[in-house]
Amino acid sequence: MKKQRNLRSMAAQAVEQVVEQGQSLSNILPPLQQKVSDKDKALLQELCFGVLRTLSQLDWLINKLMARPMSGKQRTVHYLIMVGLYQLLYTRIPPHAALAETVEGAIAIKRPQLKGLINGVLRQFQRQQEELLAEFNTSDARYLHPSWLLKRLQKAYPEQWQSIVEANNQRPPMWLRINRTHHSRDSWLALLDEAGMKGFPHADYPDAVRLETPAPVHALPGFEDGWVTVQDASAQGCMTWLAPQNGKHILDLCAAPGGKTTHILEVAPEAQVVAVDIDEQRLSRVYDNLKRLGMKATVKQGDGRYPSQWCGEQQFDRILLDAPCSATGVIRRHPDIKWLRRDRDIPELAQLQSEILDAIWPHLKSGGTLVYATCSVLPEENSLQIKAFLQRTADAELCETGTPEQPGKQNLPGAEEGDGFFYAKLIKK
């Protein structure tokens, strides 16, 4: 039996690690969830994701409620108060229970002397909630994004930035990819219906299904047998442009965790696929995905800037380059991105993408296709990146995705649509 732990203090410490130490929530959260009961795993995730999603608001409120912010060894208390405020604002947890559990969290973080302070701040918020929220709703913090990112979105999308921000602040839909080698989408939807769940097909992506209500993967018909994979609709769109074919040599570069590798093999089961990623630890997930789906590919650890180290002089018929990026198109799935990224990261990422593109292009056969993809919405990583590449690469030609002046296809995040995603299809003359 799992030891009873204070979830509020665990959430506070996790958020602190993200914001203060720059750690990814996807690395921090799973080990913490192993320490709590199945019932509490979902609440711990809700508290962590929710606080990170609304961090600007919670920070703003604390600055209004306290004369000076907690610092030094007491900094965790600042995040514990955030967890308390989040529960009062956004959850159905009865206020008395939210207060009691949050105040008790002070003991778990070895700050019992501050229980009275935490209780006082949260009760003060309850008394002043209406006027505080009215003031907050006229402040810049109401957009729940760091100012540098807000400025970039406003510049890139003067007409659409508010809808992008709004989508980023929502809970994401759950998209699935139906394994066409096992079932047609319609036949799998019938199985889903029999299981008491409802799904909606995507109009443009033939394998994509959106669940009406997110569900645990073990509840999905045939998940363990490889009938279905969790993958956002926009990520599935890569196959539209890559058009894998049996017998072709296909490189999936920056492949981890393997969602697109396995999609290639669902579309073209007899393709010769090489999956490469720089992160050896994340490659284990590529192996896991291949195993669950009963597929085979050549998996290698390697740096996209130095392909000769892992493929020699080999050339490919198709290359999918899912480039390392700011991930600004998937903020609704990973709200920690808002606080992990910095403005200075964008030119550094654009430089890295440029180096990988230049290095891998000679490994594409004449007449071959390279699909450049990112889960970013920033032009520096997307249309401007491809425009510059086309200008310096004489044998590269844009195909089907945009124009030389505005290259690529940019998806923006939407409530019933996929994540923010960019694709450019390039042909080697």
UniProtKB/Swiss-Prot annotation:
It is found in: Cytoplasm. It comes from the Bacteria. GO terms for cellular component: cytosol. The active site is at residue 375. The keyword Transmembrane helix does not apply. GO terms for biological process: regulation of DNA-templated transcription; rRNA base methylation. Keywords: Cytoplasm, Methyltransferase, RNA-binding, rRNA processing, S-adenosyl-L-methionine, Transferase. It catalyses: cytidine(967) in 16S rRNA + S-adenosyl-L-methionine = 5-methylcytidine(967) in 16S rRNA + S-adenosyl-L-homocysteine + H(+). S-adenosyl-L-methionine binds at residues 254-260, 277, 303, 322. Belongs to the class I-like SAM-binding methyltransferase superfamily. RsmB/NOP family. PANTHER family: NOL1_NOP2_SUN FAMILY PROTEIN _ ANTITERMINATION NUSB DOMAIN-CONTAINING PROTEIN (PTHR22807:SF61), NOP2 YEAST -RELATED NOL1/NOP2/FMU SUN DOMAIN-CONTAINING (PTHR22807). This is Ribosomal RNA small subunit methyltransferase B. The gene is rsmB.
